[in-house]
């Protein structure tokens, strides 16, 4: 069995586990309050104190482009329209089912999150997640982050991957 087939089967199994948690595999719609570019343009210049004064609650959606799990918490980067926003997921905030869902997510999956904005200790604008909604599973892996799509023929045949991975190509469209 080839590596891509193994990854495909592993992700299909994760999709079944997500459905077992009570999440639909491909929900029909997701209501969000802000797009990621809106959040970044409206709040990127705000300080931590300004974000806390009247707490900014929001619902956003995007594709997971980076994910890190550290015990009972984790970070991920969501991407939408070529812009990225960090999310912070804590087991105490999302509950056991929500954190189990987070542990089943992979790069390329689409999720929706609701929560409030804050700044991390390093000063990065982030969403402290209260609720995770699964939107769709990426069954095939995205190309490597650093090497990307180097094969020109593959870039033309799989144009959608080229648009996902290369911001300069997306700018042309």
What are these regions (language model features)?
Residues 1-173:
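Class II aminoacyl-tRNA synthetase catalytic cores and aaRS-like
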């Amino acid at each position: 069995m080839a590596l891509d087939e193994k990854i495909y089967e592993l992700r299909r199994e994760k999709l079944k586990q997500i459905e077992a948690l009570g999440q639909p595999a491909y929900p029909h719609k997701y209501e969000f309050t802000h797009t990621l570019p809106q959040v970044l343009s409206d709040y990127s210049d705000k300080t931590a104190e300004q974000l806390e004064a009247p707490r900014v609650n929001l619902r956003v959606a995007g594709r997971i482009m980076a994910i890190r799990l550290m015990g009972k918490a984790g970070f991920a980067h969501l991407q939408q329209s070529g812009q990225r926003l960090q999310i912070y997921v804590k087991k105490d905030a999302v509950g056991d089912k929500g954190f189990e869902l987070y542990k089943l997510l992979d790069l390329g999956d689409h999720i929706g999150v609701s929560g409030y904005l804050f700044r991390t200790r390093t000063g990065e604008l982030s969403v402290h997640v209260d609720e995770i909604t699964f939107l769709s599973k990426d069954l095939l892996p995205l190309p490597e982050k650093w090497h990307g799509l180097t094969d020109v023929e593959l870039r033309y045949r799989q144009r959608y991957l080229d648009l996902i991975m290369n911001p300069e190509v997306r700018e042309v469209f």
